[in-house]
Regions:
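Phosphate/NTP-binding elements of NTP-utilizing enzymes
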Residues: 1-182
Length: 182
């Protein structure tokens, strides 16, 4: 079984749209990301929380985790952003280029222009899984289906409540109860 770091080193390519240094992922450029990336594949770890400065690689860490899930351990992923606009922008500027530039992912996620591809702006379908991106205000996305993996970005900018439904993080966490390995 690969760790997220091993998967990223072997498969991930940084896209020119999102990286000052496009090309193969090198953990040596951000060695402090190795531990949280590898914690993701540690069965004893249930939750990873990071608080850090801007532009130190947290989003790329999450992208590596998403790539790893799609390629190695498929399941439903909910990736929460502060707003739906943020989720759409992230999908266009980060997720779509990552899929395009990573052959392993490109083989698993249908091209966005193919008919019935399952690849829309906010949902990317792959064998055994689906990546759903949403804003923290979207109660229906946060509470509508079972989710194995929950990722969140820019947590400090999230809404305090998803409509009248309550805390977005708690709504998302409740989606994991049916998965023994969430």
């Amino acid at each position: 079984d690969l760790t997220v770091t091993q998967w990223a080193e072997r498969n991930r390519r940084l896209s020119s749209e999102a990286s000052a240094e496009p090309g193969p992922w090198r953990t040596s450029r951000t060695p402090y990301l190795r531990e949280p990336m590898d914690a993701f594949t540690d069965p004893k770890v249930r939750r990873i929380v990071m608080a850090s400065a801007s532009q130190v690689g947290k989003s790329e860490l999450e992208n590596n985790i998403i790539g790893y899930i799609i390629a190695e351990d498929p399941g439903s992923i909910l990736y929460i952003h502060p707003t739906t606009i943020d989720a759409k922008e992230y999908s266009k500027l980060r997720i779509a280029p990552m899929i395009r530039d990573c052959p392993t992912l490109r083989r698993k996620v249908a091209a966005p222009k193919s008919r019935d591809s399952g690849n829309t702006l906010l949902q990317k379908t792959s064998p055994g899984g689906i990546l759903t991106m949403c804003g923290s205000t979207e109660a229906h996305a946060l509470a509508s289906k079972p989710i194995r993996y929950v990722l969140g970005d820019e947590r400090d900018r999230w809404a305090t409540s998803a409509g009248n439904e309550g805390d977005p993080w708690e709504l998302a966490m409740a989606r994991q109860t049916t998965f023994y390995n969430a």
